[in-house]
Amino acid sequence: MLAPSRLGPYFAKMAIREILEVPDSRLKIVSTVVEPHEFGPDLVTLVDDMFETMYDAPGIGLAAIQVGVPKRVLVIDLQPDDPDAPPVECGHDHEHGHEHTHTATKKEPRVFINPVILDPAGELSTYQEGCLSVPEIYADVDRPVTCRVRYQDLEGNTHEEALDGLMATCLQHEMDHLEGILFIDHLSRLKRAMVLKKLEKIRRIA
């Protein structure tokens, strides 16, 4: 008989986990801090599963709550895993009028545990964002162009890092999930209602 996970039943071992989609109420849960005693094999398994799930979707970012785990953990990888693939268009910066593309290289997985934004810049940039929890829906969202983040790695070590461009946008998007916020929550009530109606229509067709 296996010993129960220290992190509870959320951390059942599996490779590709189910991604929660709106209107699942669990997406509105505020995630809790990963405590010192929770760093260990179970956390590594969760992160491995999150990457596997994100790549399978596919996506470039995923928060733990999106797979039903209300912990302050997120993973990001802006790169595909095909050296022969063309550059990937990740979004349009309407403020500065250019596409953000990234040359296809090997995977560059990033893990952020207990992330905290220290000083978001005042300048905003508009990206067309999407989300694995709101499939096939895209909308313009304004976010700070740069930010400095403090976070822990899988060993519990603390780091500080300045981010900009798509990485800054993706980090802020995923950190919203930790507070129970979806990118569509940044839209006006009318636009959000239209988006949800469109999503219902897509699901009916599917």
State the predicted function of each range.
Residues 6-172, 177-206:
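Active-site rim/adjacent substrate-binding subdomains
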